[in-house]
Design a protein with these regions (language model features):
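Acidic, low-complexity intrinsically disordered regions
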Residues: 1-119
Length: 119
């Protein structure tokens, strides 16, 4: 399916969250014969410690008081099951938070390799 990466280093301040959610839903509803658009949201950090959160399957994996992380989670596509590790029925989100540049490269490679090789 078509893939769109939204890469940011901070919080959106020019429109309300409701508009961001609405636009992301419209984008995710677009489709080709290969399936619906996959919308990835990537929040970059200057910290290259490898502590980024990649492909979370629940908001509990994010900081409880981080509105930006929760918003990106809600805006992101569910990864197709073929991309998700075979460890249950959890649906990973197409997002990362506080990611380094090296983690971004791993995410971009998702269509080429199994998620098991990334995580």
């Amino acid at each position: 399916p078509p893939v769109i990466f939204n890469i940011t280093d901070g919080e959106c301040t020019d429109v309300p969250d409701t508009i961001l959610l609405s636009v992301s839903e419209r984008i995710k509803s677009l489709a080709t014969s290969a399936g619906n658009v996959l919308l990835f949201n990537v929040h970059l950090s200057t910290d290259d410690s490898g502590r980024g959160i990649i492909f979370p399957y629940s908001k509990e994996k994010l900081a409880a008081d981080d509105r930006t992380a929760a918003l990106l989670f809600d805006m992101s596509s569910d990864l197709p099951e073929s991309f998700v590790p075979a460890e249950g029925d959890r649906r990973a989100k197409a997002m990362s938070y506080n990611s380094s540049m090296s983690e971004l490269v791993k995410m971009i490679n998702i269509g080429s390799v199994s998620v098991n090789n990334i995580l």
